[in-house]
């Protein structure tokens, strides 16, 4: 059987998945972009687009080494990537759509932005493949975006060329959301009922989109996992402080101008960046204030009331990266909203080791992909995953994560829905315990 649909861009061929009744349309090119250029949305193609296999992931450090030989990376490799094969390329602007086989009209849409510190990850690692959401009446979308130097380098020459600089990865994400808005009706989705969701750097990305005037109207709700909220400490700053660092990288790559820098092999660029990134405060790869998409510091934008006034789900895990800080940011974000906003705290100690509810552990449950994991999950995990996916899909439908079966989640930032080894309930974690955990974490994140 062929799974053909017609979109505004042209025809697409999808494929069945391991989830009953869920059809995948994989590796859809949503944009094109040259190196250090802003993305251009794809609006058409010729013939039938083969969307039966995933597209290439963005180049990232792990593209150029064997993760099994890197002790510091082995935990997350074993968890999410072991046994899988990934293709990496600078040509990486692909997204994946997961839709019900029997279709529907005006189904809610959930667009997920992966994490990885803005330097790693992709939209089809084990925990994303395949989300259970379409079985619950929600269309799912995952995507790739440019990472590391290719996604976040800044140079004065680049600003002179385009009028603004940096954040190529964020613009990729925005263009993917635009593509979804323009095309998702062909999959049965509602372009006026889009929820964006992200975890870690993906959650921070969602946060930036929720602070931006450029993205208003593109989505109606947002979910931020382990990366949402604002703080003075974690606010974006202007690109100027990083110019000197990236000029040094360009020189060390043997390039004397932009044209030559654009021709440097990706492996060489990543190697030289990694060798030098700790030599300067400007050596990181993360969002900067570009004056267009990112227009200022988050806490100042919120103070002025210029953020998106939409419903939010936001939360963290008990053994997260900087657990007391991330939880406090999420709690404060909920507290200042004038729209229904819901706080959660995930504390299920995953079976199989003693790492607790580590950074990213909740994703197995939000996506309903426990069967892809090596861990000895039991009925507690099955029930918890069912509750979390039910609540997430209910929120995507009408901004209320309570259902007939799963009730009691109160909006506001006074307390969180605590999800763990027990029946879910409203409460707050111990601040002291979070601080102790911060310094004893066994899987601090990647």
Where do the language-model regions lie?
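Serine-hydrolase-like catalytic core of hydrolytic proteins
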Residues: 77-252, 302-322, 338-339
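Non-catalytic accessory segments of hydrolases
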Residues: 1-167, 191, 281, 377-388, ...
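A structural signal for well-ordered alpha-helical segments within the folded catalytic domains
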Residues: 23, 92-93, 171-174, 178, ...
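Surface-exposed patches in mature extracellular/periplasmic domains of secreted proteins
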Residues: 192-194, 256-260, 343, 403-408
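C-terminal domain-tail junction helix/linker
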Residues: 412-436
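Short, solvent-exposed turn/loop segments enriched in Gly/Ser/Thr/Pro and often Arg
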Residues: 146-149, 200-201, 344-353, 406-414
């Amino acid at each position: 059987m062929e799974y053909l649909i017609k979109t505004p861009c042209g025809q697409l061929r999808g494929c069945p998945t391991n989830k009953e009744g869920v059809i995948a349309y994989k590796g859809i090119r949503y944009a094109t972009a040259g190196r250090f250029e802003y993305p251009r949305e794809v609006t058409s193609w010729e013939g039938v687009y083969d969307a039966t296999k995933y597209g290439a992931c963005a180049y990232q450090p792990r593209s150029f080494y064997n993760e099994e030989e890197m002790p510091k990376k082995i935990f997350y490799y074993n968890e999410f990537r072991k046994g899988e094969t990934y293709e990496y390329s600078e040509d990486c602007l692909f997204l994946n759509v997961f839709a019900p086989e029997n279709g529907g009209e005006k189904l809610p849409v959930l667009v997920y932005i992966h994490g990885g510190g803005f330097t790693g990850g992709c939209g089809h690692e084990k925990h994303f493949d395949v989300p259970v959401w379409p079985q619950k009446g929600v269309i799912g979308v995952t995507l790739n975006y440019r990472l590391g130097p290719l996604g976040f380098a800044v140079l004065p020459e680049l600003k002179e060329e385009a009028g603004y600089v940096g954040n190529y990865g964020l613009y990729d994400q925005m263009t993917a959301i635009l593509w979804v808005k323009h095309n998702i009706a062909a999959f049965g989705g509602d372009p006026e009922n889009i929820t964006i969701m992200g975890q870690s750097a993906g959650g921070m990305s969602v946060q930036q989109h929720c602070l931006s005037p450029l993205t208003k109207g593109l989505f109606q709700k947002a979910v931020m996992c382990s990366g949402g909220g604002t703080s003075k400490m974690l606010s974006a700053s202007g690109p100027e402080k990083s110019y000197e660092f990236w000029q040094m990288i360009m020189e060390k790559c043997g390039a004397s101008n932009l044209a030559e820098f654009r021709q440097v092999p990706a492996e060489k660029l990543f190697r030289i960046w990694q060798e030098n990134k700790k030599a300067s405060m400007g050596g990181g790869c993360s969002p900067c204030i570009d004056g267009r998409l990112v227009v200022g510091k988050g806490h100042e934008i919120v103070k002025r009331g210029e953020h998106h006034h939409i419903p939010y789900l936001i939360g963290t895990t008990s053994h997260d990266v900087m657990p007391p800080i991330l939880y406090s940011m999420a709690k404060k974000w909920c507290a200042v909203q004038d729209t229904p906003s819901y706080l959660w705290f995930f504390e299920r100690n995953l079976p199989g080791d003693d790492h607790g509810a580590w950074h990213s552990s909740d994703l197995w449950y939000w996506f309903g992909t426990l069967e892809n994991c090596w861990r000895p999950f039991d009925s507690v995990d099955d029930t918890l995953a069912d509750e979390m996916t039910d609540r997430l899909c209910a929120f995507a439908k009408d901004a209320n994560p309570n259902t007939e079966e799963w009730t009691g989640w109160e909006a506001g930032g006074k307390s969180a829905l605590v999800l763990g080894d027990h029946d879910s309930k409203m409460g707050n974690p111990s601040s002291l315990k979070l601080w102790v955990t911060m310094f004893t974490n066994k899987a601090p994140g990647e």
